[in-house]
Amino acid sequence: MRSVKRQMIRMVGAALLALASSAAAQPLQRGIETRIVAELNRARADPGAYAAELRRYRTLYRGRIVWTPGNPVGLRTQEGTAAVDEAIRFLAAQAALPPLTDTRLLARAAGDHAADQERSGLQGHGGRDGSSPAERIRRRGGGIYAGTGEVIAYGPTDAASVVRELIIDDGVPDRGHRRLMFSPRFRAAGAACRPHRGWRTVCVMDFSTSPDGR
């Protein structure tokens, strides 16, 4: 319990992803919240296969710009392929993990923070009311006897991009998002996405060490 709390504090202190580009805004993918948890479970179930996908994604880099299909202006990264290469090595050494239960309680807690940032245009894990991820989960009836965690991505409009960028964790020195998502301690997750006036979109994913978020 204490170690999970310490881990969460480290994750909260990690720098946030800067994933927006100057391309025209796109609508959020239909059903993106459940797709995010499913995509993360796919990566957890077979990290080696996901590493192979990242090797193919790596070929889209030109210096620090990623030129994905349909994006004529590219996506600027901080580290270029260095972060991708590190993620590939991490995944190659990572054992398969059981799936996270997609939990409504955690999705609601994530939705509270995403909606707050939609209104405020702010970033980070702290709510405008001073709430932490653990406090928001408790307000929804969870996290009382469990460890909790949270990751946030800004900019992507589809689940695959959200999960991929959090796993690569470009610009985050301690790779806190990646380590949290592959922690064997967590057993449940829930995601929520909303529009964000500064970064197009904000996607929040909350985690719990209990199977139902409680």
Where are these regions (language model features)?
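Short, well-ordered surface patches within globular domains
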Residues: 26-142, 178, 184
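A well-ordered secondary-structure block
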Residues: 103-212
